[in-house]
Amino acid sequence: MAPHLNIVPSMFVLLLLFISASKVQSDAFDVVAKFGAKADGKTDLSKPFLDAWKEACASVTPSTVVIPKGTYLLSKVNLEGPCKAPIEINVQGTIQAPADPSAFKDPNWVRFYSVENFKMFGGGIFDGQGSIAYEKNTCENREFRSKLPVNIRFDFLTNALIQDITSKDSKLFHINVFACKNITLERLKIEAPDESPNTDGIHMGKSEGVNIIASDIKTGDDCISIGDGTKNMVIKEITCGPGHGISIGSLGKFQNEEPVEGIKISNCTITNTSNGARIKTWPGEHGGAVSEIHFEDITMNNVSSPILIDQQYCPWNKCKKNEESKVKLSNISFKNIRGTSALPEAIKFICSGSSPCQNVELADIDIKHNGAEPATSQCLNVKPITSGKLNPIPCSGPVPKTPSATA
């Protein structure tokens, strides 16, 4: 049985928190009116933004930092807690990063750290201006990539609500959620060109009670990627594509990775992506565990690999090809998944020979190949539990002999 997901209660508590905070007159800290920011697209917003944050964070009553409409240049900012009362950021304008990647010496642009009872909203845009970075970000240029910034980082937040924000053209990931508890991201818009490398829409790790709801993600890598230590998570009502789908992983590349468990992905539409519902682990490398992962009520439109478990994940062919993955996968389900596949192989279950997948369920699957050939299903080291209408027939196709090179 799946572990109890405390998502709905946490969302209710979060809603009550912000309703109760709104009943108290919040102090407004306007970066333009009070701190001298200029919406001219040239003057650095960093100092006015940080000064406004520090005053708001020190307030003993609920406070709101306001970034009015207009275009602002922001070199980088690190906004730290703990704060003395609930704090909000009302972003109405467009905030732009320096276009030149050499302006960054570490992977941070906008970072929120160690904050409780936090809300960000307002319809504003965080524009990473990543086009120059995309041209230089190759698999050989690791040092360059290591300094590319994430658009927005949420690190060590508790009870947070992120609403109605756009992330555009990030140089690396759009949003990174790390070590957070009870954080909801909803009605987000994420956009970058489909050829933009490593621009995951939302990535998270070592977090519990994460909710991603009613968001539109178009990017060059995973729309959502779930790293180690993620527990009790809900993803629903997501529109994904272009991109690489919604992925658990990659996992097993590093030592001491924490288990991933209790993830439900439902009511999503995935269009023109390389992958759809995916779990990916590295061959060889290190151990780990993934359990209670449930993909339900998902529409696939022209997706190259709609349903994929890939325990031979080997992007750029940089892995131990002759070793089995040490990550244990169990209690995984794919239910009511329908649509079309761009390639004949609509379902691929490539599990580890040393640690075969356990309790993998397929129910009510109807995926048709867009081409002349019928859709097929491939299985390696797994015996799926099946029910309902199933198209393609489970495990009806040949198994690939080499690790996959898709990212």
Swiss-Prot record:
Endpoints of the signal sequence: 1-26
Entry GO MF terms: polygalacturonase activity
Disulfide bond entries: C223-C240, C351-C357, C379-C395
Matching SMART domains: PbH1
E.C. no: 3.2.1.15
Family matches, as InterPro entries: Glyco_hydro_28, PbH1, Pectin_lyas_fold, Pectin_lyase_fold/virulence
GO biological process: carbohydrate metabolic process; cell wall organization
Residue ranges of PbH1 repeats: 180-206, 207-228, 260-281, 290-311, 357-384
PROSITE patterns found in the cross-reference section: POLYGALACTURONASE (PS00502)
Tissue: Pollen.
List of catalytic residues: D221, H244
Cellular component, GO, one term: extracellular region
Sites where a glycan is attached: N182, N267, N272, N302, N331
Compartments, as annotated in UniProt: Secreted; Secreted, Cell wall
Keyword Signal belongs to the record: yes
Catalytic activity from the UniProt record: (1,4-alpha-D-galacturonosyl)n+m + H2O = (1,4-alpha-D-galacturonosyl)n + (1,4-alpha-D-galacturonosyl)m
Alphabetical keyword list: Cell wall, Cell wall biogenesis/degradation, Disulfide bond, Glycoprotein, Glycosidase, Hydrolase, Repeat, Secreted, Signal
Function: May function in the depolymerization of the pectin in its walls during pollen tube elongation, or in that of the pistil during pollination.
Similarity-based family: Belongs to the glycosyl hydrolase 28 family.
Protein name, as recorded: Polygalacturonase
Organism taxonomic ancestry: Eukaryota, Viridiplantae, Streptophyta, Embryophyta, Tracheophyta
